[in-house]
Amino acid sequence: MKRTMWTKFITYCFGLICLAGCSSSSDPEIRTVCLRDAIGNYIIKWETIPSLAGTVRIFESDVPNQFDETEPVLQAPIDRGVSTFITNDNITRKYFKLVFNNRYSQVIGARTMAMDSVQNLRDLGGYLNKNRQSIRWGRIFRSGQLSTLSEWDADRLDRLNLKCILDLRTESEQQRDPIRYTHAPVHHLPVSTGKLQEAHERIARDQIRIGDALLYMQDYYLQLITPENSQSLAEALAMMRDSTNFPMLVQCSLGKDRTGFLIAMLLYILEVPEETILKDYVRSNESIRFELLAPLVQHFSMDAQEAVTALLSANEDFLLLALETIRKEYGSIATYQHLVLHIDEKARREIQANLLEH
């Protein structure tokens, strides 16, 4: 595969991670991505710029910060660009350390986690900020609600060693679909869904079209930045200042809107480029298993089904609308975070210290 095609593929997967902490400008840029195939094996891919000759050794661990480097689990010529770690363990999350020519190394994991009953569970590790610092793997996760939790998924969550769960759903949502996971403290920080309940009622009556759904979603995202919701968002970010709250999971109904906006604010604090922030946001469209939701809408009219699709999708335009409104009203994202979300320079440094590689 030509380099341009290879680069586009890795970028498309949104798993783009470049070697951070290079000691000099002569060090190569290393791009990696880790994916799971249909049966759970790990597909590890890499590219070096410029191309390197030699060998890449790959070590495996259940945790991202400790590897036994006595014997690699995989070894390949660097120019091969891909290797597969075969496993029948679909419970324990695996991380991999790639060592190129015994000189350059990088840790990577599969960003999206395969779950039976939980939607959209992802690790934010590996994203690079503008200073080429990487977000630490296994520290901050995002997902949909934990209200229908299988035994296998409860075991998978146990392996994450969560210290804190932030639930952004409203009180009525929490009462209707309580969190079933009991091995980590849950902090309820309700964020309003605006007029979405009205949209759901119109869907049930088959009185909604896709244009209506788009307007509801635009209103929803503008509601996220109102004073009504600012307190919960500020409290969520305040909890990220405390290192004892990590590893942390942020969740809402599907993990795409309220969670998506909060995670976007976090990534700005970590100084991640906006292009990466938007790519992470729309990745929900790949991580949500829409086939599990299909039985709920199969009897609706085609118009209603199109409206539901719009409501369930992570549309970049919705997040951009909120960001543009913030910039228009406050001048910048940083000013909004300071004045409304109470993120001063001290808070920013504390959050960065908790989540960025040093």
Label each residue range with its predicted role:
Residues 11-20:
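Bacterial N-terminal signal peptides
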Residues 2-10:
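Bacterial N-terminal signal peptides that target proteins for export
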Residues 254, 258-259:
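Ser/Thr-glycine-rich phosphate-binding loops at phosphate-binding pockets of nucleotides
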Residues 22-249, 262-358:
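Cys-dependent protein tyrosine phosphatase-like superfamily
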